Amino acid sequence: MGKKAIQFGGGNIGRGFVAEFLHEAGYEVVFIDVVDKIIDALKSTPSYEVSEVSEEGEKTKTITNYRAINSKTNEEDVVKEIGTADVVTCAVGPNVLKFIAPVIAKGIDARTASKPVAVIACENAIGATDTLRGFIEQHTDKDRLSSMSERARFANSAIDRIVPNQPPNAGLNVRIEKFYEWTVEQTPFGEFGHPDIPAIHWVDDLKPYIERKLFTVNTGHATTAYYGHVRGKKMIADALADAEIRKIVHNVLEQTAMLITTKHEITEQEQNEYVDTIVKRMSNPFLEDNVERVGRAPLRKLSRNERFIGPASQLAEKGLPFDALLGSIEMALRFQNVPGDEESAELAKILKEMSADEATGKLTGLEKSHPLYKPVQNVVAKVQKDSK
């Protein structure tokens, strides 16, 4: 029997990043989703195209050998598929992990194969697979928990690839940047060895890769989006073509670089080269990457361990400068009532109805005693004053 991977999430990242590389590694991919439109399209279309965009032009790959199941109406089928799968991946968004966990728990529990299934969450969040595992354990009988490692092994991952807004009539086809990084920890697989997926860079310690990615790519991308939004820019490339915004982004990434190089075995030169690569990628006009797409979900992006508060809090604890990140936080707070983004409306409501003190605690999760708390509270108060 051939290799089989279960991919939760049939969206752009699921189809245009995860499934692309699973397909290239020789896996049959079974997409799981609850959106009828996506499942119906995948069922009725035997192939779709992934176009990798770079300055050299576009390279198109054809993806085949997949199936699709709606977990909302066919849960038993999903359980059976997980029962005989080699790999389970997901790209659903960190907030959705708790909703996919029950069916994955049932699927893992039903396994009888001698080799455990590899579970890898592909989300923009630190320790997403650990989070998913926690939810899965909540839906597993207590007397089965001690033997779960015989049925499943869980590995955290760091993913990095820009997927811009897609053309309106793209269907299942995905336009995506050529550059990618998919780094996964290999130690959880032990004597079984990790799955054979050539696109993955397997490492013993993932934390430096996750923090470097989140605090460089995500921090830089979101900083560009929020400053761009406030200054009326439509595209990320347009925002970075503005010399002032470009300088601000570099200043922010200089501060996060200070954290990354002091915490991890990454040299200043390595980090500087990484920053240059990231800014060049984001400046690519061929991606047609929209400022509002990158800025959406500001509540999540302002939360405690995310791209702004995460690095700024650690810098503050170490007595290192974080003022440039305060600017990013301010611009994120100004991303209010953006059409199609519920979190931006909720953000506006919080800032309108709460005091600066209450809003700071709710939005950032910072303790009042934290050295970052007061500076952020001042920024919150400033934005509230300007909004009146």
From Swiss-Prot:
Active site residues per record: 213
Family note: Belongs to the mannitol dehydrogenase family.
One of the GO BP terms on file: mannitol catabolic process
Cited function: Catalyzes the NAD(H)-dependent interconversion of D-fructose 6-phosphate and D-mannitol 1-phosphate in the mannitol metabolic pathway.
Gene3D superfamilies: N-(1-d-carboxylethyl)-l-norvaline Dehydrogenase, domain 2, NAD(P)-binding Rossmann-like Domain
Catalyzed reactions per annotation: D-mannitol 1-phosphate + NAD(+) = beta-D-fructose 6-phosphate + NADH + H(+)
UniProt name for this protein: Mannitol-1-phosphate 5-dehydrogenase
Domain of life per record: Eukaryota
Residues engaged in binding NAD(+): 5-16
EC annotation from Swiss-Prot or TrEMBL: 1.1.1.17
Keywords: NAD, Oxidoreductase
GO terms of molecular function: mannitol-1-phosphate 5-dehydrogenase activity
Disulfide pairings: none
Top-tier EC class: oxidoreductase
Cellular component, GO annotation: cytosol
One Pfam family hit: Mannitol_dh_C
Self-association state and partner proteins as the record states: Monomer.
